[in-house]
Amino acid sequence: MRNLSVGSIDFTKAHVSVTLADGRILRDTLSRNPDLLKASATQRSEWTLLDDGLVSWPHLGDKVTLDTRWLLWEALCKQANDEAMAKGFKLDELQPRSREIVALWRLEADGYNGGFMQFFGNWGEENCRIALSALQAIGADATYAIVARQREILERIKDHPDLKSYEDLWSLLAKEEQDEIGDKLDPEFWKAGDEIPRLAALHYCECFT
């Protein structure tokens, strides 16, 4: 198993900063970690890096952890989205790595907000194709199967004469297709999608050993 190498962990009044061995700094707010917020400097210094990328403070309780892969994924998404903004959000002008990260971020953001149809309606076929390819590349098999099935359901209406824009998709689906996408598969995505940040961080960052 490849793991992050953590050099140090530092605290300010409001934040915890994780410095990786390659010099990269990951930050999180202490408001997300109330037990760390209340802990003394000595207690905060007694951390352990677990094999799965979690930083643990076992003396403060089993649930007092910091997921470095999740923080790393946040940082990778911000970097890729900043690159996309500089290019006018034209994904074809990005390097493949950044393109995939942006597509996955959009899938996460819209998928957890309004579901697959919001993602597909906002970003279209090309983004969906890139996201599916990226899910396969990072090994997010459970999430890939769900999103691939949702995309497959839309295939029936791709040549429908009343399909003028992505906004028409939902109304052209049969009731059972709507139910499968929204009532069955979206909730499955909300559970399975938890695998994306950690697998994506592992795949896209070279700071693992």
Which stretches of residues belong to each language-model region?
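Extended, alpha-helix-rich binding/interface surfaces that flank or overlap catalytic cores
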Residues: W73-N113, M117-C128, A134-T209
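Motif-centric detector for short Cys/His coordination patterns
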Residues: M1-K90, W123
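Functionally constrained cores in energy, signaling, and assembly domains
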Residues: G7, D28, N33, R44, ...
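Ampipathic, surface-exposed secondary-structure segments
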Residues: R2-D28, L132-D159
